[in-house]
Amino acid sequence: MYFYETHTDDLYSYVAPAPTPSRLNISFFVSRGYAVFSPDIHYTKGNPGKDAYEYVVSAAQDLAKKRFIDGKNMAIQGQSWGGYQVCQLITMTNIFKAAWAGAPVANMTSAYGGIRWGTGLNRQFQYEKTQSRIGANLWERTDLYMQNSPLFHLPKNKTPLVIMHNDNDGAVPWYQGIEMYTGMRRLGQKVWMLNYNGEEHNLIQRKNRKDIQIREQQFFDWLLKGEKPAK
């Protein structure tokens, strides 16, 4: 499953099977025998994690009833806001056998006071008013910031995760990926982190786009198809 917010408008758009900057290469994975589902997610104020759970997990549960779907071997992938939701979801359900998160926010309390390196904009607006939709500042609703931060719920996670977060990311500080990675390592959970030196929020160099596609294929083939893990 691949998600961000809503993808219905792209339902009939052609997706070229070329290496992508970070998004799931839907055409490529379908050509390898995977079924890829991209649910729409709609949000309410203060509950982005819960809303993602209700849309994504309910979709997964319904898909698992289909005879052409292997309900025991499902995975999730997302980038940026989608990556955040991947990290949050694996602390809320064990239905997915593997997960891949690009440039995720792991801790809204530490990300709240930062800036976007590319523009210098303070990040507070994002959490209060726009994409994160918390609807209050950090001190008014500390509980919601913690409730919607994967880092604080990591002991519940059972899902192997790959994180891609690059050291020149101007949108989401890469220390967010580091917090998720070191937290899972501290708890003895299965996690890997990719950092393409000098790359931004989305991969620019074609060689890196090709590399991440190979690694993503190897990861999902290993955990979902039972193939040998990459060395």
What is each PLM-predicted segment?
Residues M1-T6, Y12-K231:
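Active-site-proximal cap/loop segments of hydrolase catalytic domains
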